[in-house]
């Protein structure tokens, strides 16, 4: 039986690997997952990522980032919109995550972007997840 929410599965793998202190984690690849991981890199939550071909199936290798105290830069990562309960928001009602210390990831008509960028571009969309 397949995974019903692949994005939530990816976020859970990243969260668990960060808490366990792993250097990297591999997740199955998709276009949406690659876009989410790009934002995590741009916002400074991960060191890097690489698309890897293993046995004919695509995989994303995510290299996690830690601070000087060997604690993960990702303190929390939470899925908002799920396959059973989609959550949408207009640009006027996009909230800041943890008073601006976190990042909201939104799927808009302009592509996957951060909540801050969506407000600047005046577009709403589906709330994928929040990271802090």
From Swiss-Prot:
One of its GO terms (molecular function) is rRNA binding. One of its GO terms (cellular component) is ribonucleoprotein complex. Keywords: Ribonucleoprotein, Ribosomal protein, RNA-binding, rRNA-binding. GO terms for biological process: translation. The keyword rRNA-binding applies. Part of the 30S ribosomal subunit. Contacts proteins S5 and S12. NCBIfam families: PRK00136.1. One of the primary rRNA binding proteins, it binds directly to 16S rRNA central domain where it helps coordinate assembly of the platform of the 30S subunit. Belongs to the universal ribosomal protein uS8 family. PANTHER family: 40S RIBOSOMAL PROTEIN S15A. This is Small ribosomal subunit protein uS8. The gene is rpsH.
